[in-house]
Amino acid sequence: MKLPKAQLWLILLWALVWVQSTRSACPSCGGPTLAPQGERALVLELAKQQILEGLHLTSRPRITRPLPQAALTRALRRLQPKSMVPGNREKVISFATIIDKSTSTYRSMLTFQLSPLWSHHLYHARLWLHVPPSFPGTLYLRIFRCGTTRCRGFRTFLAEHQTTSSGWHALTLPSSGLRSEDSGVVKLQLEFRPLDLNSTAAGLPRLLLDTAGQQRPFLELKIRANEPGAGRARRRTPTCEPETPLCCRRDHYVDFQELGWRDWILQPEGYQLNYCSGQCPPHLAGSPGIAASFHSAVFSLLKANNPWPAGSSCCVPTARRPLSLLYLDHNGNVVKTDVPDMVVEACGCS
């Protein structure tokens, strides 16, 4: 298992503080001697590193152009299930970031910024477009994928749609047609024309589609995500009592508002950053644990570099579960993903 460097050094530092103060044979066997404020600051820093590592980010996204509230609310309604139950897929809402309005009333160019990592795992895509109430009659739409900036020359047909009503319309697109380049840029050209024979160019509204503000076009994507440990049985360990000396689960709730991250993490409002701590007497040594877990790997590293007695046992996680997140990425896309192994549910002696 490849260890996250930031988390490794952070927990390593914390563990060394415990060892120096308690002289324990295992850094998770005793409670921290840090003051409550110092411990809380360490927990918050660990939460930041854990979230960034789980999302494969080196730094938090900077939101320079907030989405319109109505558009954001609509995206959340589409992405947020009735309950935030973790699954094995990601959902993404990507708003058109650049709209090149052609001089023709019947053509528009939409540009989306997607992650190249999504390309090979994309299995469902829909383009949402808004037809204004002022449009009369029947509208015929065709969608093309462009290979160049202005769609000159090569282009690929993706879908067509016919409607007689205003409001939002969803066009299912072939996922193979949305494979992004290394840059992640996807350009779609829309061609639309009225089918009502009584409609003339002079009598048509200036724009046949809404392409700005609350009616901004967007892509709805579903992506398969590899989730290590999917289907792992959940075993819960009661929260440690204040004076419990034995191995147990200690709970810390981290509020994203406290981290200053509520501008880009939309849901949930926080999560449980639990960890395992306590003594492991000889009769508990070797109880079921996760040999390759992050905690046990850190403690194994500590053992290898310190003269601790052979056979000492450590308190490590024995069950974890993923954390479902709704967040804004660096490109302003709304992403729903399940970060694996984020929440410790049970502890045991390794």
Curated annotation (Swiss-Prot):
The cysteines covalently paired via disulfide bonds are: 240-248, 247-315, 276-347, 280-349
Output the SMART domains linked to this UniProt entry: TGFB (SM00204)
Instruction: Provide this UniProt record's keywords sorted from A to Z.
Output: Cleavage on pair of basic residues, Disulfide bond, Glycoprotein, Growth factor, Hormone, Secreted, Signal
Keyword Ribonucleoprotein belongs to the record? no
> Where is this protein primarily located?
secreted
Per the UniProt entry, the signal peptide is 1-21
Q: Which GO terms describe its molecular function?
A: cytokine activity; growth factor activity; hormone activity
Question: Which is an annotated Pfam family here?
Answer: TGF_beta
Propiece residue ranges: 22-236
Phenotype of the disruptant?
Inhbe knockout mice have a lean but lipodystrophic phenotype and have a severe fatty liver due to increased lipolysis in adipose tissue. Deletion of activin E does not affect the body weight, plasma glucose, glucose and insulin tolerance, liver functions, or food intake at room temperature. Cold exposure induces a rapid induction of beige adipocytes, and targeted disruption of the inhibin betaE gene blocked the emergence of Ucp1-positive beige adipocytes.
Q: Which InterPro entries match?
A: Cystine-knot_cytokine, Inhibin_betaC, TGF-b_C, TGF-beta-rel, TGFb_CS
Q: Where is it located?
A: Secreted
Q: What role is this protein assigned? A: Inhibins and activins inhibit and activate, respectively, the secretion of follitropin by the pituitary gland. Inhibins/activins are involved in regulating a number of diverse functions such as hypothalamic and pituitary hormone secretion, gonadal hormone secretion, germ cell development and maturation, erythroid differentiation, insulin secretion, nerve cell survival, embryonic axial development or bone growth, depending on their subunit composition. Inhibins appear to oppose the functions of activins. Activin E is a homodimer of INHBE secreted by the liver that plays a crucial role in regulating metabolic homeostasis particularly in lipid metabolism and energy homeostasis. Plays a central role in the regulation of adipose tissue lipolysis by preventing the influx of fatty acids from adipose tissue into the liver. Mechanistically, signals via ACVR1C to activate SMAD2/3 signaling, suppressing PPARG target genes in adipose tissue, thereby reducing liver lipid content and improving glycemic control. Induces beige adipocyte formation and thermogenesis in response to cold exposure.
Q: Which family does it belong to?
A: Belongs to the TGF-beta family.
Question: Its quaternary structure?
Answer: Homodimeric or heterodimeric through association with alpha and beta subunits, linked by one or more disulfide bonds. Inhibins are heterodimers of one alpha and one beta subunit. Activins are homo- or heterodimers of beta subunits only.
Q: What is this protein called?
A: Inhibin beta E chain
